[in-house]
């Protein structure tokens, strides 16, 4: 197994489990998003609320500061959401972003939201609200699956991966232009805004309700392990030269068909993503003397991701049909 295959997943889990690691994960200080043709005048766009009331790993002033900066550059008004969804958390909100709620070591993973909250969000969207729900690898899929189920979305809840040509599992999945449908989120307002590629950095798989558009179709043959130790055990078996088919059958299952979905729900709109890092801009810095170069992931490493994020917001807010 090549050392980089699971680096991102290991770092992300380290933040949840909080062991002492030599390397540091941080927002990339060099990432400064610009938008050539903003959809809205500065500070005049719809209100985008990024949830912070549910032990969210991605926050406005933290891991999602780059995403918030991108949206502000496009004219959106972005703020943190600090209230439960059934107690004021949906007031004066045009777009609700819920990203990796439920960061916890508790086993089994408890729901991040109460039944009353999931019912409130579903009713809000049905009445015209716009939801961007993002939940990636364990434990975030399990924490969010109750909310996802309100919209008919099934979550794999584990670690989705594909096999490389070298026979290694990789959780970094790149979606090229030829994989995409012609949904407005992909095509944008014109040819200059077309999404040419998207890269996901360690997430889960998804299955949508009838009629949902698959924005990011999982690679043919993609699979999912239930948690990081299981995925690591699989990689170790493969590295040791074990029977690949037997190891895959024992330690993984076929992935669900998507890592990104879009659909209407009543008078509202929903986008669900199975990976959150794609819309951030992160830096993994290794200690001096380690002989390892800094690693970037997110919009700073995959330029198509920023266009994808903007087009998602444009579709949710009606800039795109």
Where are these regions (language model features)?
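N-terminal signal peptide c-region/cleavage motif recognized by signal peptidases
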Residues: 17-19
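Short, surface-exposed patches at the edges or C-terminal ends of soluble domains, predominantly
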Residues: 22-321
């Amino acid at each position: 197994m090549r050392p980089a295959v699971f680096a991102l997943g290991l770092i992300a889990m380290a933040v949840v489990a909080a062991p002492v690691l030599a390397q540091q994960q941080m927002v990339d200080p060099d990432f400064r998003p610009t938008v050539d043709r903003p959809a809205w005048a500065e500070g005049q766009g719809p209100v985008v609320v990024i949830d912070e009331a549910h032990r969210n790993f991605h926050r406005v002033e933290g891991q999602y500061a780059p995403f918030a900066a991108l949206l502000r550059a496009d004219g959106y008004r972005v703020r943190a959401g600090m209230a439960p969804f059934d107690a004021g958390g949906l007031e004066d909100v045009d777009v609700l972003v819920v990203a990796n709620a439920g960061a916890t070591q508790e086993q089994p993973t408890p729901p991040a939201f109460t039944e009353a909250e999931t019912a409130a969000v579903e009713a809000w969207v049905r009445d015209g609200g716009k939801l961007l729900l993002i939940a990636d690898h364990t434990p975030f899929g399990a924490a969010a699956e109750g909310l996802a189920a309100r919209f008919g979305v099934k979550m794999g809840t584990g670690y989705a991966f594909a096999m490389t040509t070298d026979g290694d599992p990789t959780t970094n999945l790149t979606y090229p232009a030829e994989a995409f449908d012609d949904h407005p989120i992909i095509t944008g307002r014109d040819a200059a805004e077309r999404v040419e590629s998207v890269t996901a950095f360690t997430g889960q798989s998804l299955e949508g309700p009838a009629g949902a558009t698959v924005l990011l179709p999982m690679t043919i043959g993609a699979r999912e392990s239930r948690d990081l130790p299981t995925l690591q055990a699989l990689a170790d078996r493969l590295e040791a030269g074990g029977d690949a088919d037997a190891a895959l059958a024992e330690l993984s299952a076929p992935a669900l068909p998507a890592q990104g979905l879009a659909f209407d729900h009543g008078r509202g709109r929903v986008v669900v993503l199975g990976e959150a890092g794609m819309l951030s801009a992160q830096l993994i810095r290794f200690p001096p003397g380690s002989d390892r170069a800094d690693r970037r992931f997110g919009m700073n490493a995959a330029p198509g991701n920023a266009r994808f994020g903007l087009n998602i917001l444009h579709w949710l807010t009606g800039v795109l049909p």
